[in-house]
Amino acid sequence: MPIARPTFAALFVTASVLLVPASARADDMTVEAKHWQVVKRESGPVSYYTIATEDGQPFIRAQYAPGLKTVVLGYQIPEGDRRRIKKVRWRWRAQVLPNGGDECVPGRGDSAAVVYLTWKRGLRYYTLKYVWSAVGQVGRTCDSKRNPFVAQDTIIQRSGAGGGAWVSEEIDLASAFRRHFERGDPKADVPSFVGIGIMSDGDQTRSASAADYGPFVLVR
């Protein structure tokens, strides 16, 4: 039986995600390893995330082991920056792929790494879930959810072993939001960008999963 999994928006709304100021420069903000907080409401009691260091740079290391309950880390965008952030950049690398994990297949929805990007308009939360899949097809969008309070799409951003190398990503927030939630309308209003989440898991496939997450840069 597939394991029920809430949307990140639900976690973000109801959990205690602390707002911690990110390191700032003139045109961007850096969300460092120390800024992430456990999203408590739907996370298990044991966090499998640690802060590691490579070449003097701290990063988040996720090491999920079978039997653990899934844990999500979150970062809440400061109120004054929610309309100012234009792009999100990050680096990640898959270390251990969950056995046969594919977020687009019911009952196999585990990922080596996940990045959630969330906006809010009124009472409705919009989330794009970018995953590093074990076997899923890169570029595929699936598991779409739409109701009066939540809209969410899952996008397979990367798939398969990465050879232990860091991979850089950049998401244009307005473009991504309009493409997924406004049918590509270039004039559609983009609501406030309110939060980011990260997760590695293997609970559905009952297998190990591991990944590293470097600093996130929020470009104003």
Task: Give the ranges of each region predicted by the language model.
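Short carbohydrate-recognition loop motifs
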Residues: 50-70
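Bacterial N-terminal signal peptides that target proteins for export
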Residues: 1-11
